[in-house]
A protein has these predicted regions:
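Active-site loop/helix belt of alpha/beta enzymes
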Residues: 129, 145-187
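A charged N-terminal "starter" segment
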Residues: 1-131, 135-137, 160, 179, ...
């Protein structure tokens, strides 16, 4: 507006004045709505859209995103606490990432969050914690595909990596997890 940066129809200088100075963060709810709507329009209906809380864990943003997305992806107990404080249904939360600490697994299992297990060891730890808590852990397995992603700049497939279980080991691990009583959530 008038040659100045505008966010949500308001000039940056007006927002700075209202906030009482800088630095400040400004988010446009209308733009968040539009971006999610654009993404949904570009995808087949059967594809769900999850919000990665690590992208922006600000509680006001999380609360705004709640009706727009199908679920939430977290990578820490701190992010789980933000979603719990916002009243997000734990059935809509999945916890991914390597190196989950014991207390993080315990908090997630107690809350009823889906764990995306990165290894057989993490699955075993989750099952043991679930048994100790008297709760069936909700488990999915993160698959490390046996092919290399070409041209994407990503290096997450094609052999042993820190993210996920190698594809050839997934069937046995899935049978084991299901056989030990976990609530199977998928791949």
């Amino acid at each position: 507006l008038e040659g100045e940066l505008a966010i949500g129809g308001r000039t940056a200088s007006a927002l700075v004045e209202e906030a009482g100075g800088t630095p400040l963060f400004v988010y446009s709810r209308a733009l968040l709505d539009k971006r999610v709507a654009d993404l949904r329009a570009a995808l087949p209906e059967r594809i769900g859209v999850n919000y990665a809380v690590k992208a922006n864990p600000l509680p006001a943003v999380v609360v705004h995103m709640e009706p727009l997305v199908d679920g939430f992806d977290i990578a820490s107990a701190g992010e789980l606490a933000i979603l719990q404080d916002a009243g997000i249904d734990p059935a809509r939360i999945s916890f991914a990432g390597p190196g989950k600490r014991e207390e993080e697994l315990e908090a997630a299992i107690a809350a009823g969050v889906t764990l995306n297990c990165e290894s057989a060891g993490e699955a075993a730890r989750s099952l043991a914690i679930g048994e100790r808590l008297g709760q069936r852990p909700r488990i999915a397995i993160r698959v490390n595909p046996s092919f290399e992603l070409k041209g994407s700049g990503m290096k997450m497939g094609g052999g042993a990596k820190q993210f996920g279980v190698d594809a050839d080991k997934v069937p046995a691990l899935a049978r084991d997890v299901i056989g030990q009583g976990a609530e199977w959530r998928g791949l």
